[in-house]
Regions:
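Short, low-complexity patches enriched in S/T/P/G
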Residues: 1, 23-24
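Positively charged n-region of N-terminal signal peptides that target proteins for export
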Residues: 1-9
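A residue-level marker of the well-folded mature domains of exported/periplasmic proteins
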Residues: 24-30, 34-419
């Protein structure tokens, strides 16, 4: 009888040890502390905190790979956030905005991911489909518009007030234009800026309008021409867009597209350039001024932290320049106008404390008129019907009623040369 009891006790102990070992394989362990700092006798394996925390395994879906500056910004943030939190992760790159996105999400679920993030606007319907099919998994989507109306508890949208960064980039551009005017390189009425947009979506319009308002804040005589590539990433079309704008007399260029096509063309033609998503100083040392980007690491850390703690993730999350979700690269002093760093610091402080509003309706007109009211299509039901009043207190309230931009207005001073 005693022998039988001893055998049973041994089996129970073995099973207990196996259970502890299993929980450690599901949750990547933090770097082990030196033996002298954590003696085994003082911290038994069965009492390790890692065994008590829910395991998070993250899966990420990217439209392109590291060659796209847009996707590289997300990839770097994903790695940073996961490594900071000690989260195991899988990356899927080159996933088109189609059924392939759903397939990639389903594969990540099969591989044990309970947090899945996709980075491109067109991924949304397919990621939402996956969220409905796998309710035990949390799905987060950058730049999307449907979470706040879809009513799917495990589906979430996120964005950041990148228009603040675009405005700062515009300020840097305006300073450069003023320098060119003062030096006699151009006259005040030749202060024409070019902008290469991917698509004529609200996200892109919000970006180039905020950039232009930053330019005008410093250089009141500036005008801007916009051309579209109808692709998020096409080095050839982006280069051709830059060539077209330069041939039309644009003396400074910016973009909302994802390759080095335009920056390299600007460098070849000695045209100053404000970039997006990362620095181009190494490739374009003579013309790159500065760039803005969304820092996605804070959101990813927040969302994965919610999964780990079993807490709800915000349906619509918006980061700001004050929360370091919007960042500027280092200024390239070789190309920037003198005093750019000091001016950007001054304007950044004003944006953070709210004394300066990017979309202050007193700073722009539409067909010669100041806007006092405007209905925007915030509740994206697929019908493109505006329903939400977005002007209040003399400001177009961007990214307040949902995280993704909905500024889709054509303001005076900007010309779409493709129209």
């Amino acid at each position: 009888m005693k022998k039988t009891i001893s055998i049973l006790l041994a089996l129970v102990l073995c099973l207990g040890l196996m259970a502890c070992g299993g929980s450690k394989t599901e949750t990547p362990a933090a770097p082990a502390a030196p033996a002298a700092e954590a003696p085994a006798a003082e911290a038994p394996a069965a009492e390790a905190p890692a065994a008590e925390a829910p395991a998070v395994k993250a899966g990420f879906i990217f439209l392109h790979d590291e060659n796209s500056t847009y996707d590289l910004n997300f990839i770097n943030a994903a790695k940073e956030a996961c490594e900071k939190l000690g989260v195991e992760y899988l990356l899927k790159t080159g996933i088109p905005e189609g059924q392939e996105c759903y397939d990639a999400a389903a594969e990540l679920v099969d591989e044990g991911c309970n947090f899945i993030f996709a980075d491109s606007f067109g991924h949304e319907p397919f990621l939402l489909q996956a969220a409905k099919e796998f309710p035990e998994v949390q799905f987060c989507h950058a730049t999307g518009t449907q979470a706040h109306t879809a009513g799917v508890a495990n589906y979430h949208n996120a964005f950041a007030s990148i228009y603040e960064g675009r405005f700062l980039g515009g300020v840097a551009a305006g300073l450069k234009l003023n320098q060119m005017i003062e030096e006699g390189t151009i006259t005040a009425d030749q202060a024409k800026v070019g902008y290469i947009g991917a698509f004529p979506y609200a996200e892109v319009k919000s970006g180039y309008t905020s950039f232009f308002l930053g330019v005008r804040y410093i250089c009141p005589t500036a005008t801007m021409e916009v051309t579209f590539t109808n692709s998020w990433y096409d080095p050839t079309l982006e280069k051709e867009g830059a060539t077209k704008l330069i041939s039309r007399g644009c003396v400074l260029i910016s973009e909302h597209a994802d390759s080095m096509g335009a920056p390299t063309e600007c460098e070849a033609n000695n045209i100053p350039f404000v970039f997006y998503n990362g620095s181009a100083a190494d490739a374009c040392p003579n013309t790159f001024i500065v760039a803005s980007r969304i820092n996605w690491a804070p959101y990813m850390e927040y969302a994965m932290g919610c999964v780990a703690k079993g807490e709800a993730i915000d349906v619509d999350w918006t980061g700001t320049i004050a929360t370091e979700s919007v960042l500027m690269t280092e200024i390239n002093e070789q190309a920037a106008a003198p005093g750019t760093a000091e001016k950007l610091a001054e304007i950044k402080a004003m944006l953070e404390n709210g004394s300066l509003k990017v979309f202050d309706t007193a700073t722009f007109t539409v067909n010669g008129q100041t806007l006092t009211e405007y209905l925007a299509d915030v509740d994206d039901m697929g019908d493109f019907q505006p329903e939400t009043q977005v002007i209040a207190d003399g400001e177009f309230q961007e990214s307040i009623f949902r995280s993704a931009p909905y500024f889709d207005i054509d303001i005076d001073g900007i010309t779409n040369i493709d129209a």
